[in-house]
A protein has these predicted regions:
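Basic nucleic-acid-binding interfaces
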Residues: 1-153
């Protein structure tokens, strides 16, 4: 007798219960500064982090981990509703944060606003879906980004 048995173990503590669905959707998102200038520090970093949390709250997703990596790359671990597309999440994060940073951080005016295209962020981004097994590993990786930068200096 040759029987294939598939056992799936689900940690119910990681599940989110919606009105019509149960889900656990997590994404590792990375994007960077368009001109690779090291500007995401001090006041700019504070404004950026606050703004990203505000965007998440407004649009209904959660930022579980956040760090600014070397070369001014932003690393986020995001949990989202099934009806939210990653494309929309990235559009909101990049567009609204750039607008807010240019508004609140005049020091960015000289480094980015005078360029002909006036973009803060690179047009590209990286996204990876994260299963429950990888979630802790990705969270550690994101948390380690600042430590790696400090060790390089």
């Amino acid at each position: 007798m040759n029987a294939n048995i598939c056992v799936i173990i689900i940690d119910i503590n990681r599940l989110t219960y919606g009105k019509t669905s149960v889900y656990n959707l997590n994404y590792h998102l990375i994007w960077g500064i368009k001109y690779r200038n090291k500007v995401l520090k001090g006041h700019v970093e504070t404004v950026l982090k606050r703004t990203l949390y505000e965007i998440a709250s407004k649009y209904g997703f959660t930022i579980a981990h956040m760090e600014i990596g070397k070369d001014d790359h932003i690393h986020l671990l995001v949990s989202a509703l099934p009806e939210l597309s990653v494309t929309n999440i990235m559009r909101w994060l990049k567009e609204i944060s750039a607008w807010q940073l240019f508004r609140e951080c005049p020091e960015l005016q000289t480094s980015h606003r005078k360029k002909p295209d006036r973009h803060l962020w690179s047009p590209s981004y990286y996204v990876e879906s994260i299963g429950t097994v990888n979630e802790q590993a990705v969270a550690r990786y994101i948390d380690d980004q600042r430590r790696k930068e400090v060790n390089l200096e």
